[in-house]
């Protein structure tokens, strides 16, 4: 399906571009969200007639987004979750969770503004991109921890996941050391028998 874009769409084009997309993408995303119109002759003429108005509105929204960017970019938000000893979460942190954390922190955000390259399934600090406008994005840090105290330690630069890995590695090394120092089953009998033979000689 060919559509005319009503705003910039990442990896697709700029406002006014006529592009070809898959029917499902157009019907399920672009058209219902008013990001594009079917590229019919009537719709293209309609767009051109409103282009100046749309560009002015887009510029206004972009300026507002840039103002929000100066406030939210680089901010950190804490999300507390249950996790195992190795830091793996019982579940994951969703875009809705992140939007809620931002709202609780005083910033208005919708879940569809949150971009996750992959699900957050471990404790730690995770960089997340927030789309404030088709041409303006901000990066925030999501501090996922089991407790407030852990969140503060992570914010101070401590890697609790790495610390757990180091502790486990040290425990394994210690166990292997003591095992190597102990005699295997039957070694004591063999050693005693050898001493008896030496005594007879």
Curated annotation (Swiss-Prot):
Acidic residues: bias regions:
166-201
Q: Which UniProt keywords apply?
A: Ribonucleoprotein, Ribosomal protein, RNA-binding, rRNA-binding
Q: Which Gene3D superfamilies match?
A: Ribosomal protein L9, C-terminal domain (3.10.430.100), Ribosomal protein L9, N-terminal domain (3.40.5.10)
At the top level, the lineage of the source is Bacteria
Q: Show the segment(s) annotated as Disordered.
A: 150-201
For this record, the Gene Ontology CC terms, alphabetical, are: ribonucleoprotein complex; ribosome
Instruction: Enumerate the InterPro entries for this protein.
Output: Ribosomal_bL9, Ribosomal_bL9/RNase_H1_N, Ribosomal_bL9_bac/chp, Ribosomal_bL9_C, Ribosomal_bL9_C_sf, Ribosomal_bL9_N, Ribosomal_bL9_N_sf
Compositionally biased residues, Basic and acidic residues: 150-165
Q: Biological process (GO) annotations? A: translation
GO MF:
rRNA binding; structural constituent of ribosome
Q: Which NCBIfam families match?
A: L9
PANTHER family assigned: 50S RIBOSOMAL PROTEIN L9
Question: What does this chain do?
Answer: Binds to the 23S rRNA.
Family note: Belongs to the bacterial ribosomal protein bL9 family.
Q: What is the name listed in the Swiss-Prot or TrEMBL entry for this protein? A: Large ribosomal subunit protein bL9
This protein's gene is called: rplI
